[in-house]
Amino acid sequence: RHGCCKGPKGCSSRECRPQHCC
């Protein structure tokens, strides 16, 4: 799921962008 910070790497995830940070 792109733009989600709930991934394994959290906000460090490449798919997570600052503006989409949970």
Swiss-Prot record:
The alphabetized UniProt keywords are:
Amidation, Disulfide bond, Hydroxylation, Ion channel impairing toxin, Neurotoxin, Secreted, Toxin, Voltage-gated sodium channel impairing toxin
- Can the keyword Membrane be found in this entry's annotation? no
Q: Which domain of life is it from?
A: Eukaryota
Q: What is known to happen upon mutating residue 17 to A/Q?
A: Little decrease in toxicity at both rNav1.4/SCN4A and rNav1.2/SCN2A
Site, as annotated: Important for activity: 14
Main localization of the protein described in the UniProt heading: secreted
Q: List the disulfide bonds.
A: 4-16, 5-21, 11-22
Molecular function as annotated in GO: sodium channel inhibitor activity; toxin activity
Q: Where is this protein localized, as stated in its record?
A: Secreted
The PTM Cysteine amide maps to 22
InterPro entries the UniProt entry points to: Conotoxin_mu-typ (IPR008036)
Q: Which Pfam families match?
A: Mu-conotoxin
One GO CC term of this entry?
Answer: extracellular region
Q: In which tissues is it expressed?
A: Expressed by the venom duct.
The chain residues annotated with the modification 4-hydroxyproline are 8, 18
Other notes on this protein? Answer: Negative results: does not block Nav1.5/SCN5A, Nav1.7/SCN9A, and Nav1.8/SCN10A.
What does the protein in this record do? Mu-conotoxins block voltage-gated sodium channels (Nav). This synthetic toxin reversibly and potently blocks rNav1.4/SCN4A (IC(50) is 9 nM) and rNav1.2/SCN2A (IC(50) is 40 nM). It also moderately blocks rNav1.1/SCN1A, rNav1.3/SCN3A, and rNav1.6/SCN8A. The block of SCN1A and SCN2A is modified when beta-subunits are coexpressed with alpha subunits.
Note on domains (UniProt): The cysteine framework is III (CC-C-C-CC).
Give the family this protein belongs to, as stated in its UniProt record: Belongs to the conotoxin M superfamily.
Q: This protein is called what? A: Mu-conotoxin TIIIA
The organism is Conus tulipa
